[in-house]
């Protein structure tokens, strides 16, 4: 697939990874993560903080912060990053809209926050990991983490963990310790999974 006069070439396999990963994320967020009662690290968690502290709408602050992260990503990672991210973001929204038409598969998870946090992290970690592996970012958090890695040459799990820990620590200003602990488990596990999926080696077929 050729895009623009610069002839940016998109890999069909990477497009497929972005679409599959985003769909997995949407499935997990709708059927599991939304039932866990946990907060978030990263940009989503920061929008909740700003809403609590300054009464600013997450719709506004989320848009501004995500746009800023994607702008940084574009500057450091190029147009192919933006195109793969657009595919990932569109697929996520479309998939979530489809899943919303059906009842949640495991409503009982609402009474098992620890289990929901772990299972939800699996969906988020694997889904986002596939997108990042393909070179796209389904959210501003992913764009920021990928940009930091490009500059520092560090493992992608480090910026995920750092931003999540910072936001969760600040969230103690309005959330109880138990909820923060469950949230910490979710973001740490999902961040580690993203790094694992991104770096996993796929065996080459012989022949």
Model regions: which residues?
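Core subunits and conserved enzymes of cellular information-processing
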Residues: 3-207
């Amino acid at each position: 697939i050729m895009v623009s006069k610069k002839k940016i070439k998109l890999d069909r396999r990477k497009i497929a990874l972005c679409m599959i990963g985003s769909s997995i994320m949407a499935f997990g967020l709708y059927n599991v993560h939304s039932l866990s009662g946990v907060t978030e690290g990263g940009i989503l968690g920061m929008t909740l903080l700003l809403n609590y502290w300054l009464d600013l709408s997450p719709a506004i602050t989320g848009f501004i912060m995500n746009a800023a992260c994607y702008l940084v990503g574009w500057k450091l990672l190029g147009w192919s990053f933006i195109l793969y991210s657009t595919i990932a973001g569109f697929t996520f929204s479309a998939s979530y809209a489809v899943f919303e038409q059906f009842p949640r598969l495991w409503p009982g998870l609402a009474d098992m926050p620890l289990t929901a946090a772990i299972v939800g992290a699996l969906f988020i970690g694997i889904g986002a990991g596939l997108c990042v592996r393909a070179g796209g970012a389904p959210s501003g958090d992913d764009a920021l983490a990928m940009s930091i890695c490009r500059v520092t040459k560090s493992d992608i799990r480090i910026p995920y963990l750092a931003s999540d820990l910072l936001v969760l620590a600040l969230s103690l200003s309005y959330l109880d310790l138990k909820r923060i602990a469950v949230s910490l488990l979710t973001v740490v596990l999902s961040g580690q999974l993203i790094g694992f999926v991104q770096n996993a080696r796929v065996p080459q077929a012989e022949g």
